[in-house]
């Protein structure tokens, strides 16, 4: 306690009275302790520009206490790295760093700063290290303030923080943590895959988080990827535009990392252009086998081969399509990965062949950590080169794919999930039948995981809020380059009973991955809820089976263009602000708009339609957008709308593929793409392009080829003419 504090404390006792006096003395003593420890460590900041070293596509800007490397690649992506951080090595990149754009050069800017002008973007760096990304017209997309480092006293990794600003009207999208909609809410979001549950059930997967932001504003769309797998926290705050002559409040994000490099990538353009650039950088998504877009059922428990046969027969006898059975850890020998309990599964390859003839595949669980033999209960991560051999052995047992789980007692990083996915994909691809591709599912991941498989997000949050969160995760993952994902649909009365189960199943029927779990104590299916629920489930799964050719087409397009299969409704028109705030509906491709029921007891719901004509697929009624419409949503179905002029490949009654064409508005035209399943890696089959024109009541469908327009080789069914369907 110094003299000043002593005088202050005695003044408080003598003048302010006895009641406040002791508190003042105590506060002074605490201040004395704080003064003794001294202030906290000061952050290191870059300082002022000292020198510049131009190079291909950009160059290096050296500041007083750091340096910044800026590189514009030939694909339009912009790399930035502080403190000597380069783009490689990186788990996220599909290959080597793209070549620099020879036309982009580092040149002086105003006020002592520097800039790089490229075809699609301009990067400006201030003399103190603030990095600004602008459109070619000079409109700011984002502004990253200079980073700050806190060096560790023991010489360990330095913590760092960076604040960023975006326009007031901008909205953030991406899987940045627990969410209630496709947009992460204001507040702090942990960057790191949490672990919940035991890792053996369908509810054990934690949400996937990636340091990826897709930011949409009037000025344009851009994607930011911070290439740092360390744990951290992202704090978001959306901006607000001032009313009248009031000032705008910019949106902000603050990223705090526990260590690792300060580096990242930015790419700008339309949403489609941004995702195409991102796919060229992080790799094209793996193409799942066609059967992967069907109905998967997770079989847990200790039942053997006869129990698996019973589950398959129970579904097929009740008219419920089934394409795959996922075996949990109950089929493993002692819970050890890459093993089979020979007592309960003595003839597993025979069972797999038998089910394959019925159109059903087997998928095996693989715990992310294998049990250590010498000390029961502990786990170690597998040696990945050897794991490829182990995964190949799974194919020899008859498994068509694998799904990884996370053990709650074992720390698991996001990069580990990527490496395991790669080992599984490379181990299985040469062992599965020549006309098929392997299926690999993981509960967590890192940018680049999409190169090897998809993501299963588990049961997720319970209750009706979990329904909205499940949709948000699928949309967010798609915007981050992971198109194949979906939640698990499980039963049970604890969180809403049969109504919630039906609404979950109806939503999942329009998501890329559809997995169901056991219903009731008997580990049954939807029939456990009675005949009414069984009928609703039969309709939902039947529609999923009918749309399977459309899902296959969307998967091929995702591999070729990076476009997500499930898209936010603003995808074709990001400049429409009202669509940016629509979080209760989504686009499946560019042809269908799906409006799931997310509230209990609802039999009608309001749907916001984008611009253009849309048809209610249940009634055939046409609506003109943009508009809000109130439509029926009985328990047996959810509202689904088709875009006028759309061409959808669907499964015909004979098992072939036919074209479902929704009539354009009079005097308008439309079209669509169809990519048939070929069994290869997705690069081979040629896309079939169709055009649709309407003149009065007549709708004409043509296939566009290099030799000109031709008659379609597939059956065509036109819908939307006076609310009825007809054959062409």
Place the predicted regions along the sequence by residue.
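Catalytic core of carbohydrate-active enzymes
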Residues: 137, 425-431, 435-439, 445-455, ...
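Catalytic and substrate-binding clefts that recognize carbohydrates or anionic sugar/phosphate headgroups
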Residues: 2-12, 62-65, 72, 83, ...
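An acidic- and aromatic-residue-enriched active-site/binding cleft used to recognize and process polar
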Residues: 66, 73-75, 83-85, 119-121, ...
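Actinobacteria-biased recognition of intrinsically disordered, low-complexity terminal regions
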Residues: 1-32, 200, 727-728
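Aromatic- and carboxylate-enriched substrate-binding clefts and catalytic-loop regions
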Residues: 91-92, 321-537, 572-574
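A low-complexity, Ser/Thr/Gly/Pro-enriched, surface-exposed linker/loop concept
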Residues: 15-56, 69-111
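A residue-level signal for conserved active-site and pocket-lining positions in enzyme catalytic cores
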Residues: 70, 212, 315, 355, ...
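N-terminal small/glycine-rich loop or linker at the start of catalytic domains
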Residues: 281-298, 372-380
